[in-house]
């Protein structure tokens, strides 16, 4: 377990660390809920003592051979000929409108680039002029059950899960 605080410059400073033997997990996947909860609690307690604060919200790691990633893309017409936050949201929705197995869920959508009227490598499209907005993304999926089980273990420790991270 790591406890970090956000510094004014946008960097994270680690203020607490807790570690223990990882029991209840096999190859990154929960195989025993009670053992996993005990391992999380022990690491959490150590980290809280070092950081001198109680932790209530966490970003939880997820791993395992159930993690799959692939590329996707999307395209929309730009409303009002100037890219808005709504246009960006719409194009991302089209990129993730893909068929994935019912036992998988999207964990992350990583934007690789935006393209405006054929102009590639656009990083910040909002405010730019154009007629067509495209996006290339990398999508990471994981098993629904694996995600639910690790979240369940963390919640049993009295923590709120903000997000799952790789």
Give names to the regions the model predicted.
Residues 2-166:
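Nucleotide/phosphate-binding catalytic cleft detector across ATP-hydrolyzing
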């Amino acid at each position: 377990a790591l406890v970090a605080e956000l510094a004014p410059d946008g960097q994270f400073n680690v203020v607490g660390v807790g570690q223990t033997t990882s029991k209840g997990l096999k190859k990154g996947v929960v195989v025993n809920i009670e053992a996993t909860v005990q391992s999380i609690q022990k690491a959490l307690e150590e980290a809280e003592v070092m950081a001198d604060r109680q932790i209530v919200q966490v970003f939880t790691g997820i791993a395992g051979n159930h993690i799959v990633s692939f590329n996707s893309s999307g395209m929309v017409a730009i409303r009002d000929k100037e890219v808005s936050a709504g246009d960006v949201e719409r194009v991302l929705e089209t990129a993730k409108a893909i068929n994935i197995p019912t036992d998988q869920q999207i964990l992350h959508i990583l934007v690789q680039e935006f393209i405006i009227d054929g102009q590639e490598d656009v990083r910040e499209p909002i405010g730019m002029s154009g007629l067509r907005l495209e996006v290339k993304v990398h999508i990471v999926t994981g098993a629904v059950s694996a995600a639910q089980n690790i979240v369940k273990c963390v919640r049993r420790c009295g923590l709120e899960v903000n997000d799952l991270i790789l």
